């Protein structure tokens, strides 16, 4: 029996490899002689760099950058063994994990640290950058990142400002003359798991603002600011990013990648599956187990478990998903190829307590799934 375990991380709780190992322990308790293939995955957010570095025999480079609240934070990115491709998660520099829950405020947070990661990768000789969009604490349209790369945002008084979600409305002009010239000669791909536009009811502010600390009034303000930002970008670059699918990813970082860096957006899970030779690994598999921290209606729109299931169905392999939690409206994932969904949460609990017992609950859930699989296999229904 061959079981492929390809799970995403459980955000702010367990890395993808830790989830995969817990599933293997649980399944292994019932099927100790089975062949297990672990493929930690990501869809552009947390854990993506680890997956890509492992797949390319690369290395992790760590150093301090400007955090979302403009304080120094420890961040990292990955570099392939041949030093040609850099793997960057914007969450490593500009993610929610750097901002305590009580301090989350997308009006003041910045993506400047992500730009500093890109600069470092350029200094290391990167010719191709894969930038994972996801898990951000920001809503600045990528302007903070651009400022680190040399772009200057100027207000009505002629002053250069430090852009954030709350200051975009004050921009009256943009100076691109000092933008790092090396950016013109490299390939940039943004790994993106959503197709939300920059603005509007499905835009960055209204869909993702709340998890970053925004209330209703703040979301309206953020959306208006991004509309102004899009208008200014259009004046200079003749590119209207306001309605482009994916431009709203990661607080509008997608817009900056498309309009200014001339990069492309691609489903993050597709990038990861290609780099990990996923199709090769699943040949001959009897079962694939996938998962992520929360399985809900958003999972059906290009997130990691569905990306895994879509590939698996090409080979007619059944797929089971394990989630840290499962929302009542998760059923759309069945239409995308996931055959069964299980939650590791066994009783009402706080988020903090759920984090503490996540690993043992994953193992227990996997063991129970394996036990049912064993019964079904022996009965030959």
Swiss-Prot record:
Pfam entry (one): Gly_kinase
What reaction(s) does this enzyme catalyze? (R)-glycerate + ATP = (2R)-3-phosphoglycerate + ADP + H(+)
Q: Which InterPro entries match?
A: Glyc_kinase_flavodox-like_fold, Glycerate_kinase, Glycerate_kinase_RE-like, Glycerate_kinase_sf
Q: Tell me a GO biological process for this protein.
A: organic acid phosphorylation
Write the Enzyme Commission number(s) for this entry.
Answer: 2.7.1.31
Keyword Transferase assigned: yes
Molecular function per GO:
ATP binding; glycerate kinase activity
UniProt keyword annotations, A-Z: ATP-binding, Kinase, Nucleotide-binding, Transferase
Q: Which family does it belong to?
A: Belongs to the glycerate kinase type-1 family.
**Listed name of the protein:** Glycerate kinase
Organism from which the protein derives: Bacillus cereus (strain ATCC 10987 / NRS 248)
What lineage, starting at the top, does this entry show? Bacteria, Bacillati, Bacillota, Bacilli, Bacillales
| Record gene name | glxK
